[in-house]
A protein has these predicted regions:
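Secondary-structure boundary motif
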Residues: 18-19, 60-64, 100
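Residue-identity detector for threonine
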Residues: 15, 33-36, 46-48, 97, ...
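A broadly tuned "polar low-complexity/structure-edge" signature
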Residues: 1-17, 56, 79-81, 85, ...
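Nucleic-acid nuclease catalytic cores
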Residues: 31-32, 37-52, 56-87, 109-111
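Domain-level recognition of nuclease-like catalytic cores that cleave nucleotide substrates
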Residues: 74-137
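Active-site metal-binding core of divalent-cation-utilizing nuclease and nuclease-like domains
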Residues: 1-34, 53, 115-117
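Residues at the starts of beta-strands that form the adenosine-phosphate
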Residues: 24, 66-68, 104
Length: 137
């Protein structure tokens, strides 16, 4: 458990090996997204108070811990990631605050094929999503 009331659960808690250069624990919050505007993946696609809380809690872990937001971009046709400001403006504000505070955002790109899921690297991060609402999934 972590967070202000120690009532939240993190998706992954990575504990560095004793020989690691950075001894801080790494808290990882995973988000899945399928909503896009062209080659831009967006999260969230609706208001998410839970997602807002996660961003606040990740920010509060700094600097004693590393905090990572790990968006899984479940579309093979995306190259970039941004907050879904048009769906949840508050999440967008908290996203930018968290990024400025040092929360790491690592959007993972994949290619889905019959033989499996293939890693395509990290998407670039944009700090603002489109002003108009693209069609939600």
């Amino acid at each position: 458990p972590y967070g202000a009331n120690r009532r939240s659960r993190i998706d992954l808690l990575l504990t560095p090996a004793p020989e690691a250069a950075d001894p801080r624990p790494i808290y990882v919050e995973v988000k899945n997204t399928t909503w896009t505007a062209g080659a831009l993946a967006l999260f969230p696609d609706t208001v998410t108070e839970r997602g807002q809380k996660h961003l606040e809690e990740l920010s509060a872990l700094l600097p004693e811990s590393r905090a990572v937001l790990l968006p899984c971009l479940s579309r093979s046709d995306v190259e970039r990631f941004a907050p879904g400001d048009s769906a949840d403006p508050r999440y967008g504000e908290l996203f930018r605050t968290a990024l400025a505070a040092g929360v790491e955002v690592l959007p993972c790109r994949y290619r889905f094929a019959r033989e499996g899921v293939h890693w395509r690297g990290l998407a670039s991060v944009e700090t603002r999503g489109p002003a108009a609402t693209p069609e939600a999934p």
